[in-house]
Structures are given as C-alpha cells and as structure tokens.
A protein has these predicted regions:
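N-terminal leader/targeting segments and the immediately adjacent pre-domain N-terminus
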Residues: 3, 8, 17-53
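Beta-lactam-recognizing serine transpeptidase/beta-lactamase-like catalytic domain environment
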Residues: 8-26, 35, 60-105, 117-256
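Active-site phosphate-binding and catalytic loops of NTP-dependent enzymes
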Residues: 52-61
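Short alpha-helical catalytic segment bearing the HExxH-like zincin motif
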Residues: 109
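Short, conserved phosphate/pyrophosphate- and ester-handling motifs at nucleotide-, phospho-/glycolipid
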Residues: 112
C-alpha cells in the first residue's frame, strides 16, 4: 500500500491553519495466508488429543499448554499455527493459535546447534572438536552433568555432542567463549561475562531466536531475554535453560 501525504500549515503561534492534500493513499494487498484450514485443524486435533491424554495421566497438571508451528523450510511459509492453552487456576483448556507467537517458553536442548555455531563463529572451537563430557562444578556448587556421563567422563566430538544432547559440551563452549576453558577448581573471571552473553545471543538471533520473525501479524513477542543475568544463567543458556522464545521463533530456527 501507499500512505497518504498531507501538508499542514501553521500560524506564527503554532496553531493549524489549513491542511493540504499532497497525494492520496492506496490500500495494500490483503495478507495471503499459507495456512491450509484442514491441515491447521489436523494439527490442532493432534495437540488436543495428546495434551488431554497427558492431563488424564497427571503428567501435565502444571503445564501452561502445548503449541506447534508447521513451516516450509524452503520458503518460510507458515503452514499451521496451533495451540492449546491450559489455565492453571481453573484447569480449563482452550484453543490458542496466536499463543504460538505471543507466549514464550524456555526452549531446552534444541538450541544446542546454535551454541555450537556461536562457538565456531567466535573461534572458541574449531571443526568437529573433541571435548571431554564430564560433570562440571565451581567452588562446591551442584555439578552440571549430561544424562549419559552423570558419574563419569567421555571424550566426544561436536557432532556427538548434538547426537547425545550433551549439556557439558555446551557449557565448555560457553566457557571457551569467555576465554576460560574448563578445568577442575578453575578460577573464574567475570570480565568477559557480558560480552560473551552478547555474542551467544547474537548468534541465536541469526537463527531468529530473540528477534522478530517478520510475520505480518500484530503483538508478536520477540522473546524474553533478561537484561540482568548471572554466570550460572549464561552457562545454562548454552543448553537452552534461561532465555525464553516463542514457538514461531523456534520453528524459524529449525527451518534455518
């Protein structure tokens, strides 16, 4: 579309005297939805049935709901946006398709590919680098572990870190981005904490995480990225346990 242009004439006191029409505006094209209604309904039914089953089994009592976005990775076309909102006070569930772009959640391990990307971009790791997956702790704090090496250690490549969903590989990448590779009883230097979080978030944004997706719909959330964070927050962010993103952002990330 094209905006109308008008020229406003003011008197010496700043009061409007007249308005002159310079050019008329024109209506823009209607939004061409790529959502197929039958497919959309199918996705919604899958979510509803699966979530109701989890509620019945007692596994989703405190869940805020379930959301899904289907996207064509070749074109970025959104094929379905479906959601079921669960009211924790009343226990009622309701359809909430727009929640896929307005509600934010901690994403978990799906961000690990972006963490590796940040490690490569910032020369913290190179190629299919081998690191030791091991319990990581600082000054007697609870250890950060991976499910497969909770009580031991194992040398793994970057590819295997994704395959096995290694938490501690990602933490070590984050530490190397700070210029402080992990070692037992290591001394912590927080001077590079803020710059390193900025680098990590910058890479995440390249995948669409923490930034606008560009979808032409109102009230889209760009995620929740707290301004204040701790060293522990930075480390856990490397495996998806701090910043919050929308389902739509995660779909864009997966399609990138």
């Amino acid at each position: 579309g094209k905006r109308a242009e008008k020229e406003i004439h003011l008197d010496k006191n700043g009061n409007m005297e007249s308005v002159e029409n310079i050019s008329d505006g024109s209506k823009g094209d209607n939004l061409k939805l790529t959502v197929d209604l039958s497919f959309q309904q199918g996705v919604e039914d899958i979510l509803k049935n699966a979530f109701n089953a989890e509620l019945a089994s007692g596994n989703a009592t405190y869940s805020e709901g379930v959301y899904a976005v289907a996207m064509d990775p070749n074109t970025g076309a959104v094929l379905a946006m479906a959601g079921i909102r669960h009211d924790l006070e009343t226990g009622e569930s309701s359809v909430d398709a727009l929640g896929t772009m307005t509600n934010v959640f901690v994403p978990g391990s799906v961000v690990k590919a972006a963490t590796l990307t940040s490690g490569w971009e910032n020369n913290a790791i190179s190629g299919n680098q081998v690191l030791t997956d091991q319990p990581i702790s600082f000054g007697g704090t609870d250890s950060i572990t991976s499910w497969f090496t909770q009580y031991g250690s194992r040398a793994i490549t970057a590819q295997e870190a994704l395959e096995y969903s290694s938490n501690t590989y990602m933490v070590q990448v984050a530490l190397k981005m700070m210029g402080t590779p992990y070692s037992a009883d290591m001394k912590l230097d927080f001077d590079e904490l803020d710059p390193s979080m900025k680098k990590l978030r910058s890479t995440f944004a390249e995948y669409g995480l923490g930034t606008s997706t560009g979808i032409d719909l109102p009230n889209e959330s760009t995620g929740y990225l707290p301004d204040k964070f701790t060293f522990a927050n930075y480390l856990t962010n490397s495996f998806g346990q701090f910043d919050n993103y929308t389902t739509l952002q995660l779909a864009q990330y997966a399609s990138t």
